[in-house]
Amino acid sequence: MSLLTEVETPIRNEWGCRCNDSSDPLVVAASIIGILHLILWILDRLFFKCIYRFFEHGLKRGPSTEGVPESMREEYRKEQQSAVDADDSHFVSIEL
């Protein structure tokens, strides 16, 4: 039930809750979305360093070298370094 659909009214000297149309599919969907949003926000605040560090560094990695022999990796590094050395007028940073 959403707080927007609940109305508190005094009933027989007690405070009760009179909920109108709480079975409406739109109200149910809005409640589910609200709860999911709250959960995701809490997780984001708890783990934001891990999450954003993964996206920041994970996307900068370049091609995967898994299963590639070390000699080919070294050859690739030399090619990348020669590409940097060829253009002395501009500084180019390549992270491997």
From Swiss-Prot:
Biological process per Gene Ontology, one example term: symbiont-mediated suppression of host autophagy
Keywords recorded for this protein, A-Z: Disulfide bond, Glycoprotein, Host cell membrane, Host membrane, Host-virus interaction, Hydrogen ion transport, Inhibition of host autophagy by virus, Ion channel, Ion transport, Lipoprotein, Membrane, Palmitate, Phosphoprotein, Signal-anchor, Transmembrane, Transmembrane helix, Transport, Viral ion channel, Virion
GO cellular component: host cell plasma membrane; membrane; virion membrane
Segments in the Virion surface topological domain: 1-22
Compartments it resides in: Virion membrane; Host apical cell membrane
Site label Seems to be involved in pH gating, positions: W41
Organism domain of life: Viruses
Major location (coarse): virion
Record's compositionally biased regions (Basic and acidic residues): 71-80
Site entry: Essential for channel activity, possibly by being protonated during channel activation, and by forming the channel gate and the selective filter: H37
Residues bearing attached sugar chains per UniProt: N20
Extra information: When the channel is activated, one or more imidazole moieties of His-37 probably become bi-protonated.
Function per UniProt: Forms a proton-selective ion channel that is necessary for the efficient release of the viral genome during virus entry. After attaching to the cell surface, the virion enters the cell by endocytosis. Acidification of the endosome triggers M2 ion channel activity.
Domain notes: Cytoplasmic tail plays an important role in virion assembly and morphogenesis.
Family the entry assigns: Belongs to the influenza viruses matrix protein M2 family.
Name of the featured protein: Matrix protein 2
Organism: Influenza A virus (strain A/Memphis/101/1972 H3N2)
